[in-house]
Amino acid sequence: MTNGTLIFFCGKMGAGKSTLAKRLAEEKGAVLISEDDLLSKLYAEKITSVKDYKLYSDKLKPVVSDTVQQILKRGVSVVLDFPANTESQRLWLRNISDEVHSEHTCYFVDRNDEVCIRQLLKRGNPNTDTVEMFHAITKYFTEPSNSENINTVR
């Protein structure tokens, strides 16, 4: 049996990563796992800052890694709607697939700040989707580089 493929996304807040994730999961018949959905169901009232986000996001990662690897080993592809916006995040995601000898693809959703902020404000999540949060998160954003050995679709 061939392992499934791990699909993940790089792009700023509001760039359209989650919209693309939903579409690709549907098109490919893949399992969609969304960080935003998990965090909102488990920790909604507890996340009010970047520090809170990092704390609770890090709590999800070991469980998500194991779950995704089990799915991939059964030949089912996974669309993992978790950010791949820093080199360390991309390394974590690539390692999920590498450890079980699965392929991976990172979709880079490249949008300018103005478009991202406009989309972000349309979402209507006043606790997390703010211009201030956008800038606080975006200062850590880095585009994928060839040296990372990430299969990237631009």
Please state what every model-predicted region is:
Residues 19-76, 115-118:
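Conserved substrate/cofactor phosphate-moiety recognition/catalytic segment
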Residues 12-13:
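The conserved Walker
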Residues 100-119:
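Conserved phosphate-donor/acceptor-positioning beta-strand/loop module used by diverse small-molecule
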Residues 9:
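Hydrophobic anchor at the beta1->P-loop junction of P-loop NTPases
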Residues 16:
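Conserved glycine(s) of the Walker
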Residues 55-100, 104:
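Glycine-rich phosphate-binding loop used to anchor ATP phosphates in small-molecule kinases
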Residues 1-3:
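Phosphate-binding P-loop
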